[in-house]
């Protein structure tokens, strides 16, 4: 298992990714939406009242995290998608990633997550997201 998100791509990329590709090992990532941060619904400390996951989310709310969300928002607007869908589509496009794990607390969230499989990110969108998360 691996955590790999737009916020922390280095958790998987590099030696671990190379070995998984070489050995044909499937990779299923967890915390794929960075405890919900990459859904875009946590943009300030005031938003923490929306979730019991505050300890897991707080670490992402910083200038780097907000820069990543800005890039996700821009790409999402360009492909008529949500930030969660774009974040998952980016992750599913990574070499070696078989499937991301993302939780849903209601049917609407599940439908949103499933639509990520239909999002096609072009080279420009991928470059925007890669640059923001570097």
Regions found by a protein language model. Name each.
Residues 1-131:
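Beta/alpha (TIM)-barrel catalytic core signal, keyed to glycine-rich beta->alpha loops juxtaposed to Asp/Glu
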Residues 134:
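The conserved 3'-phosphoadenosine-5'-phosphosulfate
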């Amino acid at each position: 298992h691996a955590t790999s998100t737009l916020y922390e791509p280095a958790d998987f990329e590099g030696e671990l990714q190379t070995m998984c590709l070489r050995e044909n090992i499937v990779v299923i990532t967890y915390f794929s939406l960075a405890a919900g941060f990459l859904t875009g619904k946590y943009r300030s400390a005031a938003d923490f009242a929306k979730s019991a996951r505050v300890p897991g989310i707080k670490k992402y709310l910083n200038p780097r995290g907000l820069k990543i969300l800005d890039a996700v928002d821009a790409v999402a607007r360009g492909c008529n998608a949500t930030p969660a869908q774009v974040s998952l589509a980016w992750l599913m496009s990574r070499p070696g990633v078989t499937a991301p794990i993302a939780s849903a607390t209601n049917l609407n969230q599940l439908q949103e997550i499933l639509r990520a499989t239909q999002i096609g990110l072009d080279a420009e969108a991928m470059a925007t997201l890669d640059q923001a998360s570097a």
